[in-house]
From Swiss-Prot:
Gene3D superfamilies, alphabetized: Ribonuclease Z/Hydroxyacylglutathione hydrolase-like
Keyword Nucleotide-binding attached: yes
Protein name (Swiss-Prot/TrEMBL): cAMP/cGMP-dependent 3',5'-cAMP/cGMP phosphodiesterase 7
UniProt xrefs under PROSITE patterns: PDEASE_II (PS00607)
GO cellular-component term (any): cell surface
Keyword annotations: cAMP, cAMP-binding, cGMP, cGMP-binding, Hydrolase, Nucleotide-binding, Secreted, Signal
Predominant localisation class: secreted
Gene for this chain: pde7
Length: 425
């Protein structure tokens, strides 16, 4: 019996080892890689059923608010059929992408291909960041919303070195490589010594980008990589609308060749919102062809200052065409039990559902008017981990979900995202 147990242990270890050696090839579902803390909430999905009527896909790279440095606020957004993504905040980037690219079905669904040398999880994650994230919308400059971008910035650029570009031709025509080829660099692209204007855009309001440039990318906290060709800053005015075609370093004669592709076929409008003593941002993204809209809120909520947070959000709702709205990303840092005076610019479930009332009442309505939000997905960001005493013995995610559903009077589809699980919108 003793020897039988030893033999069984040996085979178990061999099997576990083979899973590690094969890296991502065996991970067809997220539960094969890690077990979420709690499955008693709806976390969306990207199966054929989930995506049947969807236009967009979002990928949570980081879902918590503080403490968990491996999963801080960050999402990717793309249109179905595209392999280019826009970052929405960037608290955690590399860890979320690493988890994502280890899912075999993800790579096939998005037709993601890698250079022959990219066999390790870290190589694939870094390649994805370089070749598939086109740029970043940053809502405010707190570290839990920009730290991932700062830390991975040294590797966030396609290199003209032979081991990355020439080896990957002609097999890879997706992501940024596909974009650059469409712009007209087909003949000389593999052999050029530098990629013309290959800087990724960092887009935000003045206060956010000024802080990133002077407090983070300043040569002291982190090397000033935007000054060395990694990024370009694009400053948005409050309430102004811009085309993504104008938020790129490429000349217009090149951008017109991709103007019907995501994200260049989208408009973005920014709104200054309250985050206690800091100015945060809400972004409305609008498809210029279909009119469909996505709203992304960086941190916001009840303030200890005189900032009128509800009025600021009201201005966002007044720019929403309710029948075109696909999703709202918004934070719920705390549960309903937390008092107003310790929220410091954050929200609770009861605050969010009041905002849903306001959205339905103040958005641009149809005729006859819509009376519910059943067509809208509500993606909850920035849930802080449950670290204190809790009489319910539940995770923060489950408590927030339950409290939202208890007062969900408009039928909005509440989603508590899990890191690395794509969600169709």
């Amino acid at each position: 019996m003793k020897y039988l147990i030893l033999i069984l242990i040996f085979f178990i270890e061999i099997n576990n080892g083979s899973r590690l050696i094969n890296s991502g090839n065996l991970f067809s579902e997220l539960k094969d890689y890690y077990i979420p803390e709690n499955l008693n909430y709806y976390s969306g999905g990207y199966s054929e059923q989930h995506c049947k009527d969807s236009s967009y896909i979002t990928i949570p790279l980081g879902v918590t608010g503080g403490l968990d440095e491996g999963s801080l606020s960050s999402f990717l957004l793309t249109k179905k059929g595209s392999s280019l993504f826009i970052g929405l905040d960037a608290g955690t980037v590399w860890q979320g992408v690493r988890r994502l690219t280890m899912l075999q079905d993800f790579n096939s669904v998005f037709n993601i291909t890698y250079p022959p040398w990219a066999t390790l999880p870290e190589q694939r994650a870094t390649w994805f960041i370089k070749n598939h994230i086109q740029g970043y919308l940053i809502g405010h400059s707190h570290l839990d919303h920009v730290g991932g971008l700062i830390v991975e910035s040294a590797e966030d650029q396609l290199s003209p070195k032979k081991n990355e570009l020439e080896v990957s031709q002609p097999e890879i025509y997706r992501g940024c490589i596909e974009m650059i080829h469409k712009m007209g660099y087909v003949s000389d692209f593999p052999n050029i010594t530098s990629i013309p204007d290959q800087k990724k855009p960092i887009i935000g309001i003045n206060e956010t980008l000024y802080s990133m440039a002077t407090d983070l990318f300043n040569g002291f906290v982190w090397p000033s990589l935007p000054n060395y060709g990694r990024y370009s800053y694009y400053y948005l005015g409050n309430g102004n609308q811009y085309s993504f075609k104008d938020l790129t370093p490429y000349a217009n004669k090149y951008v017109t060749k991709v103007q019907n592709d995501f994200p260049f076929n989208h408009l973005v409008k920014s709104f200054e919102i309250c985050h206690d003593s800091l100015t945060s941002t809400a972004f409305i993204l609008t498809d210029s062809q279909s009119g469909e809209q996505i709203v992304f809120f960086s941190d916001t909520g009840i303030s200890t200052t005189k900032c009128d947070w509800e009025f600021k959000i009201l201005q966002v709702w007044r720019n929403i065409k309710i029948d075109k709205l696909k999703a709202v990303y918004i934070e719920s840092s705390f549960t309903n039990e937390v008092a107003d005076n310790v929220l410091f610019g954050h929200l609770r479930p009861k605050d969010i559902m009041k905002l849903m009332d306001s959205l339905l009442e103040n958005s641009i309505q149809t005729s006859p008017p819509k009376t519910n939000l059943k067509h809208v997905k509500l993606i909850i960001e920035h849930i802080k981990p449950q670290v204190g005493m809790n009489q319910y013995y539940l995770t923060s995610q489950r408590m927030v979900y339950q409290q939202l559903q208890e007062i969900n009077n408009h039928g909005v589809k509440v989603i508590i995202p899990n890191q690395g699980v794509p969600i169709c919108l």
